[in-house]
Amino acid sequence: MQIVVATHNEGKLVEIRRILEEDLGADAENIELVSAGSLHLPDPVETGVTFQENALLKARAVAIRTGLPAVADDSGLIVDVMGNAPGILSARWAGAHGHDKANNALLLAQIEDIPDDKRTARFRCAAALVVPDTETGADVTGGVAADGITVHTTAADGSPAPVHARYAIKSETVELGDMPGRIIREARGEHGFGYDPLFVPDDQPAGRVSTEPDHEGEPLTSAEMTPAEKNAISHRGKALKALVPAIEALLH
């Protein structure tokens, strides 16, 4: 069975495949994960106001066009003292989408005067599985589900354009995962992306501490962990693992 991961980032596809294969076990052999990018599908406009809504929007956009089950995730950083910001705006907090250094610099400036014990935060991920109804089909513009959210992509002139739905939606599942921790005052580590160099998770790998100069012996940031160490505790790992029963149900 093919399942489409709603991303154009092949690195994310590899990460999601690794996480799911660990829990699917032998069932993993019966699933082929492909990316939306490899199918030349456009990115939908993320008009949701929560991680759950945006994850569903991305998965719906793929499922209603391809007739294949689709998995998508949406994630970001929630800083308690900032009223849960940057939240769904995490990737474009400083303005430009995906500009990690600018986002990190702005975040540090905004909480510069906050004492260490008040710099609590958490990464949150919503992971969605949308299954299309390939028997009924559809011939409508706009992938509308029970909550009334319509899927749009971007037209040539930059305006939102409703997605033409070739298939109706049969079922939807969305799960949440959190990784609690705190924000430190300077970046550490070479792995990961986004805010990983500033984030120290509460859960730490046994027997491992930072070896960075002036920080020897301190807990690791997400960016100092190996991919396997991070996946074992990550928000994305928790959310995707919670989706596994719904994915297994498609096979049996």
UniProtKB/Swiss-Prot annotation:
Belongs to the HAM1 NTPase family. One of its GO terms (biological process) is purine nucleoside triphosphate catabolic process. It catalyses: XTP + H2O = XMP + diphosphate + H(+); dITP + H2O = dIMP + diphosphate + H(+); ITP + H2O = IMP + diphosphate + H(+). Pyrophosphatase that catalyzes the hydrolysis of nucleoside triphosphates to their monophosphate derivatives, with a high preference for the non-canonical purine nucleotides XTP (xanthosine triphosphate), dITP (deoxyinosine triphosphate) and ITP. Seems to function as a house-cleaning enzyme that removes non-canonical purine nucleotides from the nucleotide pool, thus preventing their incorporation into DNA/RNA and avoiding chromosomal lesions. This is dITP/XTP pyrophosphatase. Its EC number is 3.6.1.66. The active site is at D74 (proton acceptor). GO terms for cellular component: cytosol. Coiled coil: none annotated. Substrate binds at T7, H8, N9, E10, G11, K12, S75, F193, G194, Y195, D196, K230, H235, R236. Pfam families: Ham1p_like (PF01725). The lineage of its organism: Bacteria, Bacillati, Actinomycetota, Actinomycetes, Bifidobacteriales. Residues 202-229 are annotated as: Disordered. It comes from the Bacteria. Binds 1 Mg(2+) ion per subunit. Mg(2+) binds at D74.
